[in-house]
Amino acid sequence: MMSSLCGMPLTYLLTAAVLSLSLTDACFIRNCPKGGKRSLDTGMVTSRECMKCGPGGTGQCVGPSICCGQDFGCHVGTAEAAVCQQENDSSTPCLVKGEACGSRDAGNCVADGICCDSESCAVNDRCRDLDGNAQANRGDLIQLIHKLLKVRDYD
């Protein structure tokens, strides 16, 4: 009589338990995706590039009143950022370009040294333009080598 519980055979209960576990999307502390369990369904939601804004349309909308670009930094609450209000009219979320930064990686590096989320911007060392500094350092190094070659009459 131990093989049945409330009139159902134990094999049916075990089968139902295994089936329900295999059909659920669960994550545990170590294997949850960035953003938590609810972000598992983001593959089904399409995203698009955020609207262009700023001088010459070279920036991107980061929030409803924030427009940022590598060439000009960020405009917050200005006429250049006014076009970003239109992002609120879209039902499809937009994808802000830039490396993750800020508290819990909730923002994006949108300009040299600037990290923004949809509400605010802040200076962040993770967003420094390392490629630009590397180019300047290479130029300085080449000039130094050229001067050394002239001093040694190798030129």
Curated annotation (Swiss-Prot):
The entry's comment on post-translational modification says: Seven disulfide bonds are present in neurophysin.
Q: Which PANTHER family does the entry mention? A: ISOTOCIN, NEUROPHYSIN
Q: What is its main location?
A: secreted
* Entry's Gene Ontology molecular function annotations: neurohypophyseal hormone activity
Q: What is this protein called?
A: Conopressin/neurophysin
Q: Which cysteines are joined by disulfide bonds?
A: 27-32, 50-94, 53-67, 61-84, 68-74, 101-115, 109-127, 116-121
What is the residue range of the signal peptide feature?
1-26
Top-level taxon: Eukaryota
InterPro entries, sorted: Neurhyp_horm, Neurhyp_horm_dom_sf, Neurohypophysial_hormone_CS
